[in-house]
């Protein structure tokens, strides 16, 4: 919706601008792999950005995140503002959404197995491929990126590096 895009763009615009105005040494922008085209080959590479159509169910969120990436790259070019952009794969860990019907993949599977009586039912045929990363590993990647990544708003995918099917 228009409100969703507006609010997300305004939030990140204000954060980025205030970080720049207040002398933040390096800004770490967190996005999502939903910024990539719907049919991007997996594992998705950073250079797939804006090469095809987005997934329609996520396009408002993706557009907002892409605008943040582009804004940081422009701030670096114009002002020398240092930033990096991290796109996590499917994050899982404590305090996630464990609801069996609308939770994230791994937490909802845990709930279903825990509550199982005879049979566990999943969505679809289990063939979709996903890459996962634990919250602790993603936090480590964020800290690592402050010192070790480029400063020009470059985009980095963060995940396990291995796609697995849901049924596996």
Model-derived features with residue positions:
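Conserved Rossmann-fold NAD(P)-dependent oxidoreductase catalytic core, especially the SDR/UDP-sugar
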Residues: 6, 10-59, 84
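Active-site Tyr-X1-5-Lys
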Residues: 17, 55-89, 108-117
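Active-site loop of short-chain dehydrogenase/reductase
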Residues: 23-27, 80-82, 117-119, 125, ...
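Hydrophobic positions on the long internal alpha-helix
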Residues: 11, 15-19, 71-72, 141, ...
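Glycine/proline-rich active-site loop of Rossmann-fold NAD(P)-dependent oxidoreductases
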Residues: 40, 66, 91-107, 115-118, ...
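Active-site beta-alpha turn of Rossmann-fold NAD(P)-dependent dehydrogenases/reductases
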Residues: 28-32, 87-89, 126, 159
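Short-chain dehydrogenase/reductase
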Residues: 5-9, 53, 57-69, 99-107, ...
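Flexible, glycine-rich beta-alpha linker
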Residues: 35-37, 59-60, 84-107, 128-129
């Amino acid at each position: 919706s228009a409100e969703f895009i507006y609010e997300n763009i305004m939030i990140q615009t204000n954060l980025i601008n205030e970080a720049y105005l207040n002398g933040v040494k390096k800004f770490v922008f967190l996005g999502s792999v939903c910024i990539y085209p719907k049919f991007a080959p997996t594992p998705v590479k950073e250079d797939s950005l804006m090469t095809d159509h987005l997934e329609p169910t996520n396009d408002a969120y993706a557009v907002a995140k892409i605008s943040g990436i582009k804004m940081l790259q422009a701030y670096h070019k114009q002002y020398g503002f240092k930033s990096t952009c991290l796109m996590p794969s499917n994050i899982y860990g404590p305090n996630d959404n464990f609801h069996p019907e609308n939770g994230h993949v791994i937490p909802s599977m845990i709930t279903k197995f825990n509550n199982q009586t005879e049979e566990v039912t999943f969505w679809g045929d289990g063939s979709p491929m996903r890459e996962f990363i634990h919250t602790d590993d993603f936090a480590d990647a964020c800290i690592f990126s402050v010192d070790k990544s480029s400063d020009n708003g470059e985009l980095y995918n963060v995940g396990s590096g291995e796609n697995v099917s849901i049924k596996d």
